[in-house]
Amino acid sequence: MPFVHVELIEGRTEEQLTNMVKDITEAVSKNAGAPKENIHVIVNELKKDRYAQGGEWKK
């Protein structure tokens, strides 16, 4: 039962997220031999003002 965690900066459309989840599920199923119904994809969207790189807030 594979679990895939994805963290992204917010801003993608529902359609983009849906397509991404479908593509990830397909890739894991193909390469890990797992049935699609057993693959879990968890998407966490980070607020743009809650992301830092190199010690500096990204805005």
Swiss-Prot record:
Species for this entry: Enterococcus faecalis (strain ATCC 700802 / V583)
One GO molecular-function entry: isomerase activity
SUPFAM superfamilies according to UniProt: Tautomerase/MIF
Name of the protein in question: Probable tautomerase EF_2859
A Pfam family hit: Tautomerase
Domain of life: Bacteria
Keywords linked to the UniProt accession: Isomerase
Signal peptide extent: none
The keyword Isomerase is assigned to this record: yes
Record: active site: 2
Entry keyword annotation includes Isomerase: yes
Family: Belongs to the 4-oxalocrotonate tautomerase family.
Family annotation (PANTHER family): 2-HYDROXYMUCONATE TAUTOMERASE, TAUTOMERASE-RELATED
Top-level EC class: isomerase
Lineage, top ranks: Bacteria, Bacillati, Bacillota, Bacilli, Lactobacillales
EC number: 5.3.2.-
InterPro entries (alphabetical): 4-OT (IPR018191), 4-OT-like_dom (IPR004370), Tautomerase/MIF_sf (IPR014347)
